[in-house]
């Protein structure tokens, strides 16, 4: 993947999702979605954060591109793109931005399987992967039971399997998170390449340090990243207009 490919997708996503809104309407939706994630996180387990057309557009055209750029930087910093994976499971895939960042960085891009509960997000994920000429298919449902059941055919060859969870574990309740950690640790021990990406904010992911302790004890690594902010012009203009000050692209990761 070239930088131009990623920028072309970002420009296309912005054009695709802002055309039905005035500038002020779109920016209002961006701010509202940010507030939902930052100030009203307690609602996430009970109510979808993208429960309106405006919020869905804001996620697809603003937050997903930022996730893409951050994930791509983390993938390269960790060398994840050098792993010889043939299948990439994107759990809680949203619009497919995170798996697109990883898969399009690989010399031989893997086939993607994206799992999410939201049908509109899955449709957007399929569109995203097409923009990068990636092979991808979607499954609608909760990714925790998927990993324990329907995913079994993909788990038979763990050494060629990648699993990514980008900004999705923080939306689970405590018991499902605990079950997921056990499952991911087992798959990583069997040879799967597992990448978890979460926000820098400890308030957003207060469980992360406990996960990191367990992950490191099983041979993985935990990192905190602050990458130089290199938003393309179209995304930078939206960020500034929305009133966000952004000097770096940050995330915490678990990798094995």
PLM features: residue spans?
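Class I SAM-dependent methyltransferase Rossmann-like catalytic core
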Residues: 45-74
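N-terminal auxiliary segments of SAM/dcSAM-dependent transferases
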Residues: 1-46
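Class I S-adenosyl-L-methionine
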Residues: 218-256
């Amino acid at each position: 993947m070239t930088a131009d490919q990623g920028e072309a997708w970002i420009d296309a996503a912005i054009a695709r999702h802002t055309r039905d809104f005035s500038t002020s309407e779109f920016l209002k939706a961006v701010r509202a979605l940010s507030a939902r994630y930052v100030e009203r996180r307690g609602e996430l387990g009970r109510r979808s954060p993208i429960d309106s057309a405006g919020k869905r557009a804001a996620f697809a055209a603003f937050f997903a591109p930022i996730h893409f750029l951050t994930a791509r930087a983390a993938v390269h910093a960790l060398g994840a793109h050098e792993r010889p994976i043939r299948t990439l499971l994107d759990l809680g895939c949203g619009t497919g931005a995170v798996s697109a960042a990883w898969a399009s960085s690989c010399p031989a891009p893997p086939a993607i399987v994206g799992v999410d509960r939201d049908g509109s997000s899955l449709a957007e994920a399929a569109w995203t992967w097409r923009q990068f000429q990636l092979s991808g298919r979607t499954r609608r449902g909760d990714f925790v039971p998927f990993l324990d059941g329907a995913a079994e055919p993909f788990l038979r060859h763990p050494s060629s399997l990648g699993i990514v969870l980008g900004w999705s574990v923080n939306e689970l309740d405590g018991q499902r998170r605990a079950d997921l950690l056990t499952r991911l640790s087992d798959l990583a021990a069997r040879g799967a390449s597992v990448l978890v990406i979460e926000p820098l904010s400890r308030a957003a992911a207060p469980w992360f340090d406990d996960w990191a302790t367990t992950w490191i004890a099983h041979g993985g690594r935990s990192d905190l990243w602050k990458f130089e902010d290199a938003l393309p012009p179209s995304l930078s203009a939206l960020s500034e207009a929305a009133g966000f000050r952004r000097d770096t692209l940050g995330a915490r990761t678990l990798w094995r």
